[in-house]
Amino acid sequence: MDLYPEEKTQSKQSHNSENNMQIFKSENSDGFSSDLMISNDQLKNISKTQLTLEKEKIFKMPNVLSQVMKKAFSRKNEILYCVSTKELSVDIHDATGKVYLPLITKEEINKRLSSLKPEVRKTMSMVHLGAVKILLKAQFRNGIDTPIKIALIDDRINSRRDCLLGAAKGNLAYGKFMFTVYPKFGISLNTQRLNQTLSLIHDFENKNLMNKGDKVMTITYIVGYALTNSHHSIDYQSNATIELEDVFQEIGNVQQCDFCTIQNDECNWAIDIAQNKALLGAKTQSQIGNSLQIGNSASSSNTENELARVSQNIDLLKNKLKEICGE
């Protein structure tokens, strides 16, 4: 299937409709950028586990109706694999950990989607973040002790501990430093702060090396991602969350994000199953809850004990009244 409309392309865009591939390039005094986009039709070797529910195992259906249902509920898996490359020089004033660099933006994604046919473009709803390779290169001579710290975070997450995707510490004394982060998750294209999902923060520790306005280093990064019509379209390779290139092992180290320890110590819990709940996405209204109790919770046990004590007090009071009245 040809995913791209037949129209004239700009001079800086290489378009190969036969292979369903597009290459975008841009270069000026501010830096260089290059983007590659490939359709799923060229990558048939991608395998995944289908999320399916066999209707025949639920309902007794005539053969003809079964065939019609299969056709009606079939869905084409649209996947566009993209590789984005950018290079930019960094002012030493901006290398103090006070600012962030968005590695993927809504504007960039919309530019990629605009090249697709309308019937394909309207189905795209997710972006899957596969890998980010980051190369730092000094704009000064080798041999100067220049420690640097880098962190890639999902700045949509409020917790500073949980927002970390990967962090690395190295030294530009040898001229360059490189590492790779594998986010391996998908997000909706309609998420409010998409531009903050891949935020790069860099802290150049030798802040007195140059003055404000001097370019201290070059950041070159490659982002591999996929645009799809489903959250279930992509499987990721089983890489670590962050890797340091072998040649840089002696001058740097990395810190990957932690996976939380889940403890199954809460066997008694409740869930609100009240009627007339608000529709997902609609304005919520206050309503009286109706909790379904699972197990015997501590709060439930405390309530029962309290009621028992109240009942005993009532019985004692009743007996006292009988004594006073001479009954």
UniProtKB/Swiss-Prot annotation:
Alphabetical keyword list: Coiled coil, Host cell junction, Host-virus interaction, Transport, Viral movement protein
Short name of any one Pfam family annotated for the protein: MP
A Gene Ontology BP annotation from the UniProt entry: transport of virus in host, cell to cell
Protein purpose: Transports viral genome to neighboring plant cells directly through plasmosdesmata, without any budding. The movement protein allows efficient cell to cell propagation, by bypassing the host cell wall barrier. Acts by forming tubules structures that increase the size exclusion limit (SEL) of plasmodesmata, thereby allowing viral ribonucleocapsids to spread directly to neighboring cells.
Coiled coil spans: 297-327
Compartments reported by the entry: Host cell junction, Host plasmodesma
Subunit structure: Homotrimer, through the coiled-coil domain. Interacts with VAP. May interact (via N-terminus) with host prenylated Rab acceptor protein 1D (PRA1D).
Organism: Cauliflower mosaic virus (strain NY8153) (CaMV)
Superkingdom to which the source organism belongs: Viruses
Name assigned to this protein: Movement protein
InterPro entries with a match to the protein in the record: Caulimoviridae_Movement, Viral_movement
GO CC terms, sorted: host cell plasmodesma
